[in-house]
Amino acid sequence: MDDKSMARGRKAFVTGFPIKHSRSPLIHGFWLKELGIDGSYEAVEVKPEDFSSFAASLAANGFAGGNVTIPHKEAAYAAAESLDEAACAIGAVNTLWLENGRLCGGNTDAYGFAANLDASAPGWDKADRALVLGAGGASRAVVHALLSRGVCHVSVVNRTLSRAEELAAHFGARVYAHGWDEAQALVSNAGLIVNTTALGMSGHGEGQDFPIDLTCAPKEAVATNIVYVPLRTAFLNKAEKAGLKTVDGLGMLLHQAVPGFERWFGQRPQVTQALREHILADMAKAGAL
């Protein structure tokens, strides 16, 4: 039996609360059509108080698995009977699948972050030092990716220092916590600068100047944002003006979807320019560029 026959009729999902904004159905729908797989992928809105029962009934509802987004990633971590290494390190699950009747959980955010940089800025992981702006949930996946790829020194800057200290303590050696007032001084020797903050996102000071001068960064440094709405944030615009290589966050969204699709439908999809343009067209239609 070939992969397409095995995947025939398989169902997968993305769940969150709210979920109508998700572009995951567009991504997976594109791949299902491109690969000629007779499967489906749908958005399912689940309230936080209903998540446990939803996760327990995946098989009964005919799902092979699915993606999990805000606010359910920690609940999915707790619900999974088996976790992959990334989920254990990050403490959150964004991908669920069934294996021999067991609910398994993984986290593909770190993979997506690194794969996006591999595609758009090859050699980024030669940087000895990285600067991560922000210490929220998303920064955990970024730090895990950086450590996994051998970055020697990761500085995490956050307005609330205790959040950065908590993250540094979680990952241990090679991760250092700093207050926001130290960010400027850390730019000068950072080979990679990652913005995980909401600064510059839609509804979070969009259009305002980014509050850090990036002109003193090493000329070979790479600057990347993990958000993709808007595509070109104030941070990326400022980095570009400073002459740095910039990588937007859309590729992370696309690449993090790859492992889950392969688990549910049996074929590994490719992140292509055609897929990127498909999502950009939808963003343009929604006024999200």
Curated annotation (Swiss-Prot):
EC numbers on record: 1.1.1.25
Source species, domain of life: Bacteria
Binding-site list for shikimate: S22, R23, S24, T69, N94, D109, Y228
The keyword Transferase is assigned to this record: no
Mitochondrion among keywords: no
One of the record's GO cellular component terms: cytosol
Listed Pfam families: SDH_C, Shikimate_DH, Shikimate_dh_N
Cross-referenced InterPro entries: Aminoacid_DH-like_N_sf (IPR046346), NAD(P)-bd_dom_sf (IPR036291), SDH_C (IPR041121), Shikimate_DH (IPR011342), Shikimate_DH-bd_N (IPR013708), Shikimate_DH_fam (IPR022893), Shikm_DH/Glu-tRNA_Rdtase (IPR006151)
PANTHER family for the chain: BIFUNCTIONAL 3-DEHYDROQUINATE DEHYDRATASE_SHIKIMATE DEHYDROGENASE, CHLOROPLASTIC, SHIKIMATE DEHYDROGENASE
Family, per entry: Belongs to the shikimate dehydrogenase family.
UniProt function note: Involved in the biosynthesis of the chorismate, which leads to the biosynthesis of aromatic amino acids. Catalyzes the reversible NADPH linked reduction of 3-dehydroshikimate (DHSA) to yield shikimate (SA).
Name of the protein this chain belongs to: Shikimate dehydrogenase (NADP(+))
Organism encoding this protein: Brucella suis biovar 1 (strain 1330)
Gene: aroE
